[in-house]
């Protein structure tokens, strides 16, 4: 336990909280341009070809973003919206692309969980 005198000389340091998504700069989403669209493999024990893209954001950051859902229409120079949220089995991927916003189309033939994949309500 520190004495009063010690605390007067050197107060207790506030704990600094480190952001999991520094490139967003405290914004909910950010816009960016795809510089590379490719697939990568996850860590053990999983196995797949995960779709990801490198995105140059409007604030100058370049980040790797995951493209969720089955199939996508992204290519180089596509303008995308990115949100936070890491992909546990892809090291270094801390962002998700928002489906159905800007140049990124929603997922085709999606009936459930539509809001997460940018799909309008089907006509029925």
From Swiss-Prot:
User: Gene Ontology cellular component?
Assistant: small ribosomal subunit
Q: Quote the subunit structure annotation.
A: Part of the 30S ribosomal subunit. Contacts proteins S8 and S17. May interact with IF1 in the 30S initiation complex.
Q: What is this protein called?
A: Small ribosomal subunit protein uS12
The alphabetized UniProt keywords are: Methylation, Ribonucleoprotein, Ribosomal protein, RNA-binding, rRNA-binding, tRNA-binding
User: Where in the sequence is 3-methylthioaspartic acid found?
Assistant: 89
The family database entries (Pfam families) matched by this protein are listed as: Ribosom_S12_S23 (PF00164)
Q: Which SUPFAM superfamilies match?
A: Nucleic acid-binding proteins (SSF50249)
């Amino acid at each position: 336990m520190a004495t009063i005198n010690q605390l007067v000389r050197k107060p207790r340091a506030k704990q600094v909280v480190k952001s999991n998504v520094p490139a967003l700069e405290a914004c909910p989403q950010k816009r960016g341009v795809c510089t590379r669209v490719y697939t990568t493999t996850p860590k053990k024990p999983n196995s797949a070809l995960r779709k990801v893209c490198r995105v140059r954001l409007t604030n100058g950051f370049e980040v790797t973003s995951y493209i969720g859902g089955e199939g996508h229409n992204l290519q180089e120079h596509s303008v995308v919206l990115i949100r936070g949220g890491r992909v546990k089995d892809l090291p270094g991927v801390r962002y998700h692309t928002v489906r159905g916003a800007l140049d990124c189309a929603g997922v085709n033939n999606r009936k459930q969980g539509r809001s997460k994949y940018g799909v309008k309500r089907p006509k029925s």
